[in-house]
Amino acid sequence: MPELPEVQHTADSLGIQIAGARIARVERLDWTRMVETPSPDEFIRLLTGRQVRGWDRRAKWILLFLDDGWTLALHLRMSGSLTVHPAEAQPDKHTHLALRLEDGRQIFFLDPRKFGRARLLDSAGLAALDAAHGDEPLSDAFTVERLASLLRNRKRAIKPLLLDQSVIAGIGNIYADEALWRARIHPLRPAADLSAAEVAALHDGIRAALRQALANGGSTLRDYRNSYGAGGTNQEHFNAYDREGRPCPRCGATIIKTVVAQRGTHYCPACQAIPSATTNRRE
């Protein structure tokens, strides 16, 4: 699933290309379950003729700000991508939403697994989407102290907590593994048991893993492409994720893959060992 870096690159590469453009019509919507709100018919009616005024990202949602206070929110889920094409381009069978711009260009929402979602939101709907998600981990407000407050008194294992979009927004399986590796924290550690030093290391690890991925254009393992059709290279720089059976870049121990909260999880058993029960509680 595209995570914060991939969604950010998609939002930026799409927004740069279509800012100021007007949506002439919805050319294709052949998987109506993609549209969460409003009804598919209303979605088509309200979207027609709207101008793209700007763009942003919230959590793993791409936000296209339209005129008259509407926002088109798009979620790529597992296999989605958004690309811009010339007028004569023909969508393939996996393109379930196609928008025709007034200048003739087209926006294709390609989604082989049909998990992608679209919402057309008014100001109240946008506020609700924002409120449903937690802290943005690259924002100035996401300090070490803020992370400590989010983890305090939470007995959940740290990895599923990092994946909880209502707590911290935008982190998925890849960057949870990478952040925990950087911080030398076992993915099953209870969040509340992390020491102050470990919380600081995790804060640094989260931001470093995400910033590295942004600098490398995101991670392309299977489907991810930005809106120019280009993949990322961050997968060439993984330290733990997708490295089962390979040596840890830091200590040389063999990276292990296990399952945590029903998610494949990669970690180093030496660097990320679980410490004794009473030595690491936060002061």
UniProtKB/Swiss-Prot annotation:
Q: Which Pfam families match?
A: Fapy_DNA_glyco, H2TH, zf-FPG_IleRS
Renumbered zinc finger spans (FPG-type): 239-273
How many and how are cofactors bound here?
Answer: Binds 1 zinc ion per subunit.
GO MF entries: 8-oxo-7,8-dihydroguanine DNA N-glycosylase activity; class I DNA-(apurinic or apyrimidinic site) endonuclease activity; damaged DNA binding; zinc ion binding
Top-level division of the source organism's lineage: Bacteria
Q: Where is the active site?
A: P2 (schiff-base intermediate with dna), E3 (proton donor), K60 (proton donor), R263 (proton donor)
Q: Write the Enzyme Commission number(s) for this entry.
A: 3.2.2.23, 4.2.99.18
What binding partners and quaternary form does the record give? Answer: Monomer.
Q: Which HAMAP family match?
A: Fapy_DNA_glycosyl (MF_00103)
PANTHER family for this protein: FORMAMIDOPYRIMIDINE-DNA GLYCOSYLASE
**Function field:** Involved in base excision repair of DNA damaged by oxidation or by mutagenic agents. Acts as a DNA glycosylase that recognizes and removes damaged bases. Has a preference for oxidized purines, such as 7,8-dihydro-8-oxoguanine (8-oxoG). Has AP (apurinic/apyrimidinic) lyase activity and introduces nicks in the DNA strand. Cleaves the DNA backbone by beta-delta elimination to generate a single-strand break at the site of the removed base with both 3'- and 5'-phosphates.
Designated name of the protein: Formamidopyrimidine-DNA glycosylase
What is the source species? Roseiflexus castenholzii (strain DSM 13941 / HLO8)
High-level lineage: Bacteria, Bacillati, Chloroflexota, Chloroflexia, Chloroflexales
